[in-house]
Structure formats: structure tokens, C-alpha cells
Amino acid sequence: MMLSEQAQKWFPTHVQVTVLQAKDLKPKGKSGTNDTYTIIQLGKEKYSTSVAEKTLEPVWKEEASFELPGLLMQGSPEKYILFLIVMHRSLVGLDKFLGQVAINLNDIFEDKQRRKTEWFRLESKQGKRIKNRGEIKVNIQFMRNNMTASMFDLSMKDKTRSPFAKLKDKMKGRKSDGVFSDTSSAIVPSTHMPDANPEFSSGEMQMKSKPKKPFLLGPQRLSSAHSMSDLTGSHLSSEKLKSSTVGPTHLLSRQIDSFGVVPESGSLKSPHRRTLSFDTSKLNQPGSIVDEGEHSFGRQSDPFTNVTASLPQKFATLPRKKNPFEESSEPWDSSMNLFSKPIEVRKESKREKREKVSLFERVTGKRDSRRPDKLNNGGSDSPCDLKSPSAFSENRQDYFEYESTNPFTAKFRASTIMPSSSFHVNPTSSEDLRKIPDNNPFDATAGYRSLTYEEVLQELVKHKELLRRKDTHIRELEDYIDNLLVRVMEETPSILRVPYEPSRKAGKFTNS
């Protein structure tokens, strides 16, 4: 047989024998019944079931697993014979023979049956008279156990040492806890490293902190739990992207091209905290709100439409946080930088609190009881916060993030936020706002009206590629789950029982 043909065939490594029950046994006991047990033997390995007392139709349902010493294949010269010997336990004297059966495993495997449940007739010993001794029901299943490195304990066990050897170890300063013992292990535990070389220790810690490779190789290789825990990093990168959109159109396209390149690992570096606070201070200025009101205020937009391709692909199935004040005007940048710098420390502390939103709050939409009180009181602790230019934008952004963009809450809405009465808007812009008609609240084109034709094409191509990769990944997961379910049903069908009854193991004979 060629190696290519042999690689395509399935060869078992173990055989699992389950002795279910027996019937029509000859009575050997005093009261016309038997105390019956069965010996299961393959090669030199033996197992025994428990004793079913005072019955002629015992039921055991006990299994024993044997490792095949060689390769079981069609046309193999080596024969594997499974022996089942039914015995009656005798309290006085030797146990009495009730019957036996010899099953050729090669014939069952050549019939291409991985599992076989059948009644076998019990036979007499060789040279004895043939008579009806009853039947036994047995389930035979061929299995393949892939022996990986994780299934072995590579650490060597301590041997029994003489008192002189132990005294010798004490003289050499060896300890009994295994730190300085002469045992070896392939898996080295992490121990305390000396501080003599700090550069080596820091490099070693960086190597240990490297994450393991995921199981499935694909574009979306991280689990949903990992991706949901990294939502804060994606929000920071999206805010950095929005702050970079201030300026001419060619700068916008350049920023989109630079941010659109997502590495294959699905992670994106978050900007520096000080740089982020400086950029978001420009976003939260009143000038940006006025400019938003003049151009696109009053339009009902979908909170999910401003998701750009800069976000990693693992966040594709989760709701994003939307900043309602996307645009800002250049004349306000230079004048409002003076107001944003004194409150930079306070904004950093608020942003850290907002980043620490738990995974439970993101999924269920529930929040702490303190947050609604803060919103009702105006979102500030002191009156000076109300006068600051970023107080309104910070509170409005918090309210929008937790109430508007979370589709799991009952208060989900896709409409834009109206400015408060404390915010001063010039009368000309307010008159223009009244003339703008109300559009569809779920207008998907609202976030793309400020983009050029080339930028819209780039977004379309990126979204189509993202959907294609997602469909491929979902199809791979479905196939994997289907194959896994079929294997579970074939290998252990008892797991589908309601209620689940674990199978009993037969006792193994020890060579004494």
C-alpha cells in the first residue's frame, strides 16, 4: 500500500467494548439463579464487570477500552481476538463457567463498521460437549485517540531512594520541593528571576506576554469575548479618525487611506492619551456644534452609518459608539484651544471612567444608578463646568453613547440630539434649521453626503470585502460545528440521553 493511499484511510488505535446484558443462562446457583459477571480480555489485558446477583438475565452496561498493539487494517496478518467469558461467582470453591465467546475484530473492521451491537451465542470450552448456554449482547466500537503532547506528563517522578541517597542530597543542599532536585521536566515552571540583569528580565517578560495563536486561521481570528473587551481601543481610534477629518477634502481622503489599512491580526494601536485629549478637545467645541447645525443638523441619521474601515474586522458584528458632533470648523480651532488646555486633566479622568465600562453594560445596555442622576443634574459637579465649552459636549456624548447607540436598550433612537437652551446659537442659523424638512430617521446615506465619489467607492469596496470575509468565516465555523457534532454523536451517543447517564467502567485485573 502506498503512503498516499494509507494516509487517506482511517485506522483505529483503541477498541471500546461495552457488555450490555445476557439472557438464557444455565442456572448454577442453589436457588436456581446465578451471580454472574463477565471477563473481557484482549491480548494480555483483562477487565471484569460487576456481579449481577440472583438473576438469569443479568444487565451490566459496563465498558472497557483496549489499546490495539498494532495497526488494524484490511489484510493484516495479525489477528485480534476479543474473548468474553461469563462466570458464576461461587462463595465456596472456584467460580463456575457459564459460557464464552471469541470475537474476531479483524472481520468487524473489514466490514467497515466502526460500531457494532449484536447478540453473540455463548459457546462451551474446547473439547467439551456443545450445548445451548445462552447469549450475550455486546457493543464494539473502534476509536482513534490522537495522542498529543498535552496528554502526557513529561515530568519524571521521583524514584524510591535509599536513606544514604537522601542523606547525600541533604549534604549537597538539595531540597525536597523539586526546585534543586535531580528531576527533569519538559515543561519548565516560571520561577523568580534575579534582578542583576533588568534588561534581560524585561525582554523575557515581553516574550512571555505574547498571545497564543488562535485556533482558526481566518480574518476574524479572535473570539467575540476578546473583541468586546477591546471596544475601548476601537473607540479611541475612531475618535482620532474623526478629529483628523477637519480640513480640506484631500486631507480627508489621505486620512481614510492611512487609517483604512488594517493589519491582519485585527488590532489597531490606540493613540497616545495626551494627543487624544488634544484632538477630542477640538471635537467638543461649540463651534463644531454650530457648523454641524448649519450643514447637517435636523437630518435623521443612522448611528451605525459612520463606521469606517479603520475599525478592526473583529468589531464588525458589534454596535459602535457614534459621536454626534462629527464636523468642526477651522475658525474655532485657534480660539478654543485656550479653553481646552486648562480642562485637559479633567477630561482625561472622565475619559478613563468612560473606557472602564464593563462588558455586561455593553451587551445588556444597563448602567449604574449613578449615571442617570448625573445626567439629570446637568452632568457636572460644579457650576464652572457648565460654563466650560466642553461640558455640554462631554455630557451629550455620554448620553448619546449609552442611550442612543445601544440597540439593546428600549430607549434606542437614531435621531440627532438637539442643543440645549443654554447653548447660544445665532438667529440666522436657527431660521435655516427650521426650513430643513425632516427626512427618514433611518437614512443610510446621511453619513456619506460629505464624501466624494472616490471615497464612497473605497468605502463600498472595503465593506464588500469585509462581508465576504465574514461570510467565509461563518461558513467555516458552521462546518466545524457540524463535523464536531457528528463526531460526538458517533463516538458517545449516550451523551444525548435525557437525563445523561455516564457509562460504568469495568474493573481491570492486576497481575499479582
UniProtKB/Swiss-Prot annotation:
Gene3D superfamilies: 1.20.5.2440, C2 domain (2.60.40.150)
Positions of the UniProt region annotated as Disordered: 174-231, 263-287, 347-390
Every FIP-RBD domain range: 437-499
Keywords noted in UniProt: Cell membrane, Endosome, Membrane, Phosphoprotein, Protein transport, Repeat, Transport
PROSITE patterns given in the database record: C2, FIP_RBD
UniProt keyword Aminoacyl-tRNA synthetase, yes or no: no
Keyword Cell cycle annotated: no
InterPro entries membership: C2_dom, C2_domain_sf, FIP-RBD_C_sf, FIP_classI, Rab-bd_FIP-RBD
Residues in C2 domain copies: 1-120
CDD domains according to UniProt: C2_Rab11-FIP_classI (cd08682)
Alphabetized Pfam families for the sequence: C2 (PF00168), RBD-FIP (PF09457)
Any one Gene Ontology molecular-function term assigned to this protein's record: protein homodimerization activity
Membrane topology, from the record: Peripheral membrane protein
Motif NPF 1 per record, residues: 323-325
Modified residues (Phosphoserine): 227, 277
Compositionally biased tracts (Polar residues): 221-231, 277-287
A cellular component annotation (GO) from this entry: phagocytic cup
Region listing for Necessary for its cellular translocation to the plasma membrane, in residue ranges: 15-102
Subcellular location: Cell membrane; Recycling endosome membrane
Modification note: Phosphorylation at Ser-227 by MARK2 regulates epithelial cell polarity.
GO biological process, one term: insulin secretion involved in cellular response to glucose stimulus
Region (Necessary for interaction with AP2A1, RAB11A, subcellular location, endocytosis activity and homooligomerization): 465-512
Protein name: Rab11 family-interacting protein 2
